[in-house]
Structure formats: C-alpha cells, structure tokens
A protein has these predicted regions:
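Accessory helical-bundle/CTD segments and flexible terminal tails appended to RecA-like ATPase motors
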Residues: 1-31, 45-193
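Short, conserved loop/turn and helix-capping segments at secondary-structure boundaries
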Residues: 33-40
C-alpha cells in the first residue's frame, strides 16, 4: 500500500500488515505552534492502518529527529504523555489555550498597496490597543501569493478574544482602505499559512 497522508484518514484496510511513514518529522519543521500536535496525530493515525485484521501489524517510521517528543510519544501511543508535554510547551510560550491568537490577513493584487495599508493599520492598532494586546508583524504571509493576490499578516495575542475583537472591529470600521485591498480576521486559526 502506497499513499499520501490521505491514508491516515479513517480508511479501513484489514489486510495491511506493514505501514512505512517517510519523513515523519517533516511536519515538525513548519512555522506553526501546532506542528508537534499534527505530527503526533499523523503518526498515530497512519500507524493505526497496520494490523487491523486478524494478522499483527508493523510500523516503520523514517525520521531525522527520532528523539523529538512527538515521535517518541507516538511510538508508545502515549496520548496522555504527549498532551501533558504539549500543554507545558504552550504554557511556557503562552500559546493557545493559555491566551488567544488572532490572525489578521490583508490581501490584494498590488503588494505595495497591501503592505502600505497593513503598516498603517498596525500603527493605528498599536496606538489604540498596544497596552492590551501583543502585536507581531506585519509580515509577509507564509504563502505569499494565492490567485494573484499578495498576502500580508499581523498576529495579535490576547487573554480575551471577544473583548479584543469588538475593539478591533470598531477601529476597523473607521479605517479606510482602497476597495481592492481586503482583510479578514481569524481567531485561534487552525492553519497559520
């Protein structure tokens, strides 16, 4: 059986006795605080494809970081241990669920114009809310261009998303941009790209 990550998603192959996972740690090296969680989930899910029938299964994992916690916890199917380790890491760096992460994406066909508006917005926000939230950016989004639109982003960290969003929406209503520049806000986004 040869496949992509798709084979991890709930398919039942009762005669599969060997599963190999190539570059299992590749997802660990992306700019996303959930990278360890996604890596752990993928390994556990793919491992679950082997040995579903009457015959025992075996899993071979290729990794360049065999001692990484997600790899080791997945190797032992230690869900509780992984959860405790991951929560401790997130507490240490103050990532969700310990505070909210809000992504503010600006996009448009003219990169200079998009960059101009996101920089102006960052100044407005810093002046109005700099004491109540942590602002990171602006920066080019990890996927810089989609469908001929350039993308830039800001990140906001806050203890309460609802209060911050209300204030941001209020400020945003008074912030004028050209019609060909768009923005969107995502609270605790699942994807950071």
């Amino acid at each position: 059986l040869v496949g992509t990550q798709m084979i991890a998603k709930g398919l039942d192959f009762p005669n599969v006795t060997l599963v190999g996972l190539i570059d299992a740690d590749k997802s660990l090296h992306v700019e996303d605080f959930r990278a360890a969680e996604r890596t752990f989930q993928l390994i556990v899910q793919v491992s679950g494809r082997a040995g579903r029938g009457d015959r025992a299964g075996e899993v071979i994992i290729q990794t360049s970081t065999p001692h990484a916690p997600p790899i080791q916890f997945a190797r032992k199917s230690d869900f509780e241990g992984f959860q405790l380790e991951e929560l401790e890491q997130r507490r240490e760096f103050n990532y969700p669920p310990f505070r909210h992460l809000i992504r503010h994406l600006f996009r448009g066909r003219n990169p200079e114009k998009v960059n101009f508006y996101i920089e102006q917005w960052a100044k407005v926000l810093e002046q109005a809310m700099g004491d109540s939230i942590e602002i990171r950016g602006p920066a080019v989004a990890p996927i810089e261009k989609i469908r001929d639109e350039y993308r830039f982003q800001l990140w906001y960290f806050a203890p309460s998303a609802s209060q911050v969003i209300q204030r941001i929406v209020s400020l945003r209503e008074d912030f004028k941009m050209d019609r060909d520049v768009f923005d969107q806000i995502d609270v605790d986004p699942m994807q950071l790209s």
